[in-house]
């Protein structure tokens, strides 16, 4: 069944093994190993449509972002570009699509970046490297020439998030609102609420430009 899903994508090489990869909480992720030494291995993902209902929009955003970053890296004379930006594989039936629908499920494939690791334990060195990577990401996308779509409505809208919180507090579904520890956290949030919503207001007023968020 998994090999059938892979067959919907325009990849190089013959599939020799497919096994789970990583411990992600949102999408189902698999490593696709190829038999040929000159063919890359791949990552196969089933996109969670409960979280991302508009997969086409998600993938169009990804295409815009990765294409822009790739051009920036090429212009800067960077080496090993395929290690620095993701390469998604087109669907066989439509090379403009970076996903395939198989039995109602949405799948995507990308080239696997060999010898890459995910840090589970945080230390100052890793934090510094992560901060640098996010900074480079933001800098490269500051002049992206297209407007990306909002994949999860109001995901970063703190006014909306605080309203959600207040509605849950009013209902108190598990009877914990009165607990001292919970009250302390709620007071802390309330004290910072004005500041938390400042960016949203400044964005509406045109003071802050929209930026791409990872």
PLM regions: where:
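Short N-terminal amphipathic alpha-helix/helix-capping patch enriched in small hydrophobics
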Residues: 14, 25-28, 40, 58-62
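ATP-binding glycine-rich phosphate-binding loop
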Residues: 11-35
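Conserved hydrophobic/aromatic beta-strand scaffold that supports enzyme active sites
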Residues: 29-31, 107-109, 212
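ATP-dependent phospho-/nucleotidyl transfer catalytic cores
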Residues: 19-23, 45-46, 52-56, 113-128, ...
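Short beta-strand element of the conserved SAM-dependent methyltransferase core
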Residues: 32-34, 110, 189
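ATP-binding pocket architecture of kinase catalytic cores
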Residues: 37-61, 67-148
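Residue-level detector of alpha-helical secondary structure
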Residues: 4-5, 28-31, 61-68
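Juxta-kinase regulatory segment immediately upstream of eukaryotic protein kinase catalytic domains
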Residues: 1-19, 69
